[in-house]
Regions:
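Bacterial Sec-dependent N-terminal signal peptides
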Residues: 1-20
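A composition-driven surface/loop motif
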Residues: 20-137
Length: 137
């Protein structure tokens, strides 16, 4: 009986574990999810301050650097109207892949004095049948 109760409690507790939500884009080859969106600098190759606001769909790069080999620094697969917000001086260094690759509508938006430098051995920005808008950069 005791084992039976333990099994029931274990099964019920696993039912309450929520699955992580994916937001439809990747940073440095890693899905941005409900588990990691507040601090994307935990991803290997990402430094500075990088975070995502799911309510406004804004990915903020704040004096950030993304350095990767073999994957895109930012890959927007299905996040419609993603805004890449630039604060301060930002750098993307990518080898063997496109720096920013968009499959959905994306806006790269800066404020006064913000910059984004893309260094790449292939192409800096690749957009596949989707609008890309660059504002105040």
């Amino acid at each position: 009986m005791r084992i039976f109760l333990v099994l029931i409690v274990m099964m019920m507790s696993s039912a309450f574990v929520m699955a992580q939500e994916k937001y439809g884009f990747k940073v440095a080859g890693v899905d941005v999810t409900s588990d990691n969106y507040l601090d994307l600098t935990e991803i290997n190759g990402v430094s500075g301050k990088v975070y995502f606001d799911p309510n406004t769909r804004a990915l903020t790069l704040d004096n950030a650097t993304i350095e990767v080999d073999g994957c895109n620094a930012i890959l927007n697969e299905t996040c419609r109207n993603l805004v890449i917000e630039l604060l301060g001086t930002n750098t993307i260094n990518v080898t063997n892949s496109a720096g920013i690759y968009t499959c959905e509508s994306t806006v790269i938006m800066g404020n006064s004095g913000s910059t984004l430098t893309l260094k790449n051995d292939r192409c800096a920005v690749l957009f596949e049948g989707s609008p890309l808008e660059i504002v105040n950069c």
